[in-house]
Amino acid sequence: MKSDIQICRDTALTPIDQIALMAGIEPQDLTPQGTLKAKVKPSILNRLADKPEGKLVLVTAITPTPLGEGKTVTTIGLAQGLAKINKRVIACIRQPSMGPVFGVKGGAAGGGYSQVAPMEKLNLHLTGDIHAVTAAHNLAAAALDARLYHEERHGYEAFSDKTGLPALRIDIKNIVWKRVMDHNDRALRMITVGKNEAGKAINGLEREDGFDISAASEIMAILALSKDLADMRQRIGRVVLAYNIDGNPITAEDLQVAGAMTVTMCEAIEPTLMQTLEGVATLIHAGPFANIAHGNSSIIADRIALKLSEFTVTEGGFGSDMGFEKACNIKAQQADRGPDCAVVVATLRGLKANSGLYDLRPGQALPDAIFSPDEKALIAGFDNLKWHIRNAAQYGLPVVVAINRFPQDTDVELELLKNMVADTDFSTYVGVAISEAFGKGGEGATELAQAVVKACETPANFKPLYSLSQSLEEKLMAVAEVGYGARSIELSDCAKEQLATLKKHGHDNLAVCLAKTPLSITTDPGIKGAPSDFVVPVRELKLCAGAGFVYALCGNVMTMPGLPEKPAYMNLDIDADGNIVGLS
């Protein structure tokens, strides 16, 4: 089979203005960015206000291997499959970060014959939204350090007399806003800024700082959760950058930088329209990771797609304990709109990896045996799929299991897994279909599409795990105990102090976003299957007042990834004709 990029390159694509018209997007709603991608103006929602909404299908997965289990392939394949059975459909996905593109996973455009195209445009820069997020975020960081420098240089009273501005009295030891970049770079996790030559202070005040990856930026979360430009402006103003010497928060509004940050983001708020290899309209917008952020594409893109189509297919990052949980408890509560159906992607290799019969270690390649027939391991790993089905169902949703077929998979094991799903009593609607979207495109996903249409005939009774009116502790416990199946949570001394500060400043009404490993339902990546009776350790709590959640760092999760020993960038090059090679 040809490589992903070769398949994409060999496929004749439709001009984006025609894709837009077929989807119901008129020329005045569109800002073309060349012939194969365009920005869609959020003002389209004014024209579509009276149109009914279609069904929202949320794709999730079992606990994945580091290779991923084909969730984006399934999302794109399902959209193409729905189009094959004559349903109006739009897919909504996140913009890929260049960190994973150059790191371990490679691109995030799907694969095989279920891709968003051109895949190299999607995976590398696209329309620059992530760069806009990075610029807006780092503008706030630069403004904060500049204000700190000038206030300390002059003294608070003299600074106010000179500028007419109130002194913010920034506590240099309580600055919470790091810088960001769209690369994996572990060397930048802990740095010192403001270093000067002896006797000089022209470079600012020396302090400890660090970088996160742009996908973990609160500005990225704000982009994904804003309803419109005015909402984004207000949210950016609420971002807390530091605390003053009295312990009170200093916001982007206080620093008078929120307006400029929003100006930097004014085009990023427009979703980007592209197409699948079969000409299905796809909206790409925002790119928060699901392990260290909330892991879903934007509310704006969903709202546009729901008004234009019978079915909107979107995805939450990693397994149902990750992006799916955050879609249901964060995104849905802010959008006032829950999904109508959950699709759980499962693979033979992924279930075998969760069997407990293989010695799997983080950072090491999967053993060759896991790709070979092994019914014992498949049966043992089935507990993980059952866990994810029941987890999705507890939100009141009908569930469809999509068994994503790989070339090495045998018919015997695929049918065994399909029968195990069909023969298990889940006390809710659970459909199952084998998806061959990777190798056959939409034609290979029509069985899955029909199963999803049938599932959506069952009315959803969507209900998040918690109400925003509950306390932060109750919300953390709800996610850990109900969302993960843990026995309890355990707050570090640092987290307890931060919790008290959050309550003091009136942030008890925010959602919670738990950052943890995606490779286990627990916070330990080495624990596979469907564990229970474990504790979720919360080491740190961070306020994301603009995004509307409190960020809980659990276990050893890092907000700036590092590159592996053999990164994916080693495979990338460009030929004499300007064609990119090695991107997957």
Curated annotation (Swiss-Prot):
MF GO annotations: ATP binding; formate-tetrahydrofolate ligase activity
EC code(s) of this entry: 6.3.4.3
Q: Give the GO biological process terms.
A: tetrahydrofolate interconversion
| Pathway given in the UniProt record | One-carbon metabolism; tetrahydrofolate interconversion
**Keyword Amino-acid biosynthesis recorded:** no
Note whether Ligase occurs among the keywords: yes
Q: Which domain of life does this protein belong to? A: Bacteria
Quickly give the catalysed reaction: (6S)-5,6,7,8-tetrahydrofolate + formate + ATP = (6R)-10-formyltetrahydrofolate + ADP + phosphate
Residue positions binding ATP: 65-72
| Assigned keywords, A-Z | ATP-binding, Ligase, Nucleotide-binding, One-carbon metabolism
PROSITE patterns according to UniProt: FTHFS_1, FTHFS_2
- Which top EC class applies here? ligase
Family per record: Belongs to the formate--tetrahydrofolate ligase family.
Q: What protein name does the entry list?
A: Formate--tetrahydrofolate ligase
The beginning of the lineage is: Bacteria, Pseudomonadati, Pseudomonadota, Gammaproteobacteria, Vibrionales
